[in-house]
Every structure is written in structure tokens, then in C-alpha cells.
């Protein structure tokens, strides 16, 4: 290895290697003689030659008694004006050209990097990639070659890897939308006075793991007692904060909204009960792909909306004196859709097809309310969700040749437990404070979610 200066310009002789073989010879400095710079005697050969000398001085000149080229020749590049040049006199054999792994490259033309070699002197391709660049040896004339580097653009393999990571983060967003939408079907306002009106104000906090995300919202619920056996209502759930997985941003602009209706067999709530409810959520969603290798940090804006519809049949009865038990069975249809979009801010943007998850599920379990005191109650539920039908699109993107769609529904859980526990406290006959925590398994990638909800209810 030579990293300094060897100057034999006044000696009249070249630098001579006379015996043995050289595995790797690296010249990061300068060697200069009157005649050929380096002379190899007899059959002595070099396995790998790495060279930085040339552009900022004279080219590294080689001659050999057998004229045998090194097995591998790697140019060392420090900048567009500082790189290796090789001048080989009357060569025989062949060499494989490459770029030294420690080089600092930029797009452009590196002139006369090799002189003295014909096309037949090269083994293998005279083009390739180095980092995020493509390179090609350009035969500008005779036996003179320029090296041309240009940005290679994102490779299909690296883009596929970044797409797989985006799919994982988007599954987290779909899980979050599913958790929030399904929990909203439990919103109710059932405390009435002489006017048959009810209003509830509260706050919701939801969290999802794998990948981690959370959101909080202010919730307003209204109820109206149509008759002793029928009541209706609606709600608004306005997000105030969203902490989404990396590369995902969900806006707080649009509230989730929904409506519900109950029919009870008896005015006191015992016996059969039929409930129908729906919820609608529409959010602006922004994505940024992770950079993996040559892939680009593509940005995109789209919308994420979910719709859920629930029909529930239950039967309430008293167990002993202080406990109300309500077994239930329900059917729920949920649709979560991300609109199609095209990335911006990159040289090779990806275009994504719409992504939709449609699920019909059966829900069964039991709810209870246990009177702790005349004013305080313990409430809770235990149940299971079973998917009856599910259709999930694949995450499909185009824009880079060779991409394949990602299986968005991989590791999907079709049977999911759900449980809740909470308490209510009647401040007065027409005022109630309540809190509840619900925990459930979510559909995508072995994920659990939890929601805490606290509200203050007033009856009129």
C-alpha cells in the first residue's frame, strides 16, 4: 500500500516488483517515474489494484513482462476532480472494473479513468451501481474510457421494503379507526326527567399497541325519550389529539358522528331490548415512507373513513337483589377505507390504489350492573367478537418497476375477546357521573387496544 509519494522521476528506472504475487495493492498517494510507473517482472500478478492517482496528477502507469492485468481494478474517487486514472501499456488478460468501497462519489463524468484497454480487456459488465448511483464505463475513443455516474433512482427491492413498513404503520391506523368506531357504538344518554331530554359531555382516550398510537377526544351525546319504551340519540366525537405511528399523521379537523335508537320491552329496562346504532368517521391522513437504501421519502395526502352499523338484541334480568344481568347478541358491519393517492416531493412518486377493509362480525357476551350503594353502581361486560365475513384489499402501489402488492391482511385475528369495567355515580336524580375502560383484541398484527371514557350526564 502506498499512501504517500514515491518519486523516481530522476532515476530513469520504474518501480519494479520482481518476485512473488501481490494480493491487494492500494495506491492512495502518488507514484511517478520517467518511464512506466510500475513494472511487473515475469509472471508476477496483482489480485486487486485500488488506485486514487490520476486526475490531480499523472495517471498511474503500468507495464509487465507478461503484460497481465490485475484480476480486479477499483478506482478510488475522492471528488469529481480527484480520482484514479490507470494507463496500462500493451495489456493481456482481463480485469473486472469497480469503484472502491470507500469512495466519495457524485453524479458526473470522470474523464480518462482508463487508457490502454480495449472492450475485450474487461471481465463482466462495464456498468453497475454504487450506493444510490448508477455507473457506466464509456468508451470515448480507441482504448480510452470515461466513467459516468448518475443517480440510480430507487430500486424495486428497497422501495418494496419501505412499502412493507408503510403497510405495518397503516395497519395501526386501521386498528385505531376500528377501535374508536366500534367503541362509539356504546355511547348512550339515558337519564331523563319531565322533558324527556338528556345531554352528556365527556372525554375519550384510546390507545393501540404494535405500532403504538393514541388519541383523545371530547364527546357530546344527546338523547330523547320518544315514549316509555323508545329512545333515540346521537353523538359527536371530536378529536383533540392524535399520536399516530411513525410516518402517519391523522388530522383532528372532522368529528366522528353517529346515531342510535333503543326499544325496550318494559319501561324499567328489564326483558328484551333492541338497539340499532351507526357511526361515521372521516379524517385527512398524511403518509411519509421511510427511507430504506435507495428508496425515497415519498409524501402523500389522502383520507381515511370508517362506517359501522350495529344491531343488538339483549335480555335483561335481575340476579339476586342488586345485580342486573344482560346477555346480548349483535351483528356489526364495519368498513374502513383509505382513498387512492399519489406521492409528491420525490423524483419517483408512487401511486396507491384505494385500500378497503370490510368486515361483518357477530358479537356475543354479557353486560352487568351491580348496585354498590343506592347511588353508586359497578358496570362491566365480557364478550367475544367473531368475524363472519372479511375482505381486505392488498396495499398496491405503482411507479417503480418490479413492485408487488403487500398483503395487508396478514396475521389477521378473526376471533377477538373484549371486556369492560366501570362505575356510575348518581349525584342527584338528574345528574350522573360515569367512567369506563374497555380493552379488546384488534384485527391486525396481534394488536390490543384500550379506551377510557368519562362523562357527565344531565337529564331534563
What label would you give each PLM region?
Residues 1, 12-20, 32-43, 57-65, ...:
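Glycine-rich beta-solenoid repeat tracts in large extracellular/virion proteins
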Residues 1-7, 23-32, 47-55:
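Right-handed parallel beta-helix
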Residues 2, 27, 49-51, 272, ...:
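Polar/charged side chains located within well-ordered beta-strands of beta-rich proteins
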Residues 32, 56-67, 141-193, 389-408, ...:
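Primarily extracellular Gram-negative trimeric autotransporter adhesin
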Residues 155-321, 325, 438-439, 443-445, ...:
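Outer membrane beta-barrel translocator domains of Type V secretion systems
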Residues 242, 246-248, 282-302, 337-358, ...:
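Solvent-exposed, glycine/polar-rich loop segments of beta-barrel outer-membrane systems
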Residues 258-259, 352-460:
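Outer membrane beta-barrel transmembrane domains
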Amino acid at each position: 500500500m502506498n499512501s504517500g509519494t514515491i518519486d523516481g522521476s530522476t532515476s530513469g528506472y520504474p518501480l519494479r516488483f520482481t518476485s512473488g504475487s501481490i494480493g491487494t495493492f492500494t495506491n492512495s498517494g502518488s507514484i511517478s517515474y520517467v518511464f512506466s510507473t510500475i513494472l511487473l517482472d515475469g509472471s508476477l500478478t496483482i489480485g486487486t489494484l485500488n488506485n486514487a492517482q490520476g486526475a490531480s496528477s499523472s495517471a498511474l502507469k503500468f507495464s509487465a513482462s507478461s503484460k497481465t492485468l490485475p484480476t480486479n481494478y477499483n478506482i478510488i474517487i475522492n471528488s469529481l476532480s480527484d480520482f484514479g486514472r490507470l494507463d496500462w501499456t500493451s495489456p493481456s488478460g482481463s480485469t473486472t472494473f469497480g469503484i472502491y468501497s470507500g469512495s466519495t462519489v457524485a453524479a458526473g463524468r470522470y474523464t480518462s479513468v482508463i487508457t490502454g484497454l480495449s472492450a475485450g480487456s474487461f471481465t463482466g459488465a462495464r456498468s453497475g451501481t454504487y450506493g444510490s448511483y448508477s455507473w457506466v464505463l464509456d468508451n470515448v475513443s480507441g482504448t480510452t474510457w470515461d466513467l459516468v455516474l448518475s443517480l440510480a433512482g430507487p430500486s424495486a427491492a428497497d422501495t418494496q421494503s419501505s412499502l412493507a413498513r408503510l403497510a405495518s404503520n397503516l395497519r395501526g391506523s386501521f386498528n385505531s379507526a376500528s377501535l374508536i368506531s366500534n367503541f362509539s357504538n356504546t355511547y348512550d344518554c339515558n337519564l331523563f326527567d319531565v322533558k324527556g331530554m338528556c345531554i352528556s359531555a365527556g372525554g375519550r382516550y384510546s390507545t393501540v399497541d404494535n405500532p403504538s398510537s393514541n388519541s383523545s377526544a371530547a364527546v357530546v351525546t344527546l338523547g330523547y325519550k320518544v315514549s316509555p319504551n323508545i329512545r333515540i340519540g346521537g353523538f359527536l366525537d371530536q378529536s383533540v389529539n392524535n399520536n399516530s405511528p411513525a410516518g402517519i399523521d391523522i388530522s383532528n379537523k372532522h368529528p366522528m358522528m353517529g346515531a342510535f335508537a333503543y326499544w325496550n320491552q318494559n319501561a324499567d329496562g328489564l326483558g328484551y331490548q333492541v338497539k340499532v346504532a351507526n357511526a361515521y368517521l372521516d379524517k385527512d391522513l398524511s403518509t411519509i415512507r421511510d427511507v430504506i437504501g435507495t428508496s425515497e421519502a415519498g409524501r402523500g395526502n389522502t383520507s381515511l373513513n370508517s362506517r359501522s352499523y350495529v344491531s343488538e338484541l339483549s335480555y335483561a334480568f335481575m340476579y339476586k337483589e342488586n345485580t342486573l344481568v344482560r346477555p346480548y347478541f349483535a351483528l356489526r358491519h364495519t368498513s374502513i377505507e383509505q382513498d387512492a393517492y399519489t406521492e409528491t416531493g420525490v423524483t419517483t412518486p408512487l401511486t396507491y390504489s384505494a385500500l378497503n377493509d370490510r368486515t361483518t362480525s357477530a358479537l356475543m357476551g354479557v353486560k352487568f350492573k351491580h348496585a354498590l350503594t343506592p347511588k353508586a353502581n359497578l358496570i362491566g361486560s365480557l364478550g367475544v367478537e367473531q368475524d363472519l365475513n372479511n375482505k381486505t384489499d392488498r396495499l398496491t402501489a405503482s411507479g417503480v418497476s418490479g413492485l408487488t402488492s403487500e398483503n395487508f391482511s396478514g396475521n389477521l385475528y378473526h376471533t377477538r375477546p373484549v371486556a369492560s369495567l366501570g362505575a356510575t355515580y348518581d349525584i342527584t336524580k338528574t345528574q350522573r357521573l360515569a367512567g369506563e375502560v374497555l380493552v379488546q383484541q384488534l384485527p391486525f398484527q396481534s394488536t390490543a387496544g384500550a379506551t377510557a371514557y368519562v362523562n357527565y350526564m344531565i337529564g331534563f
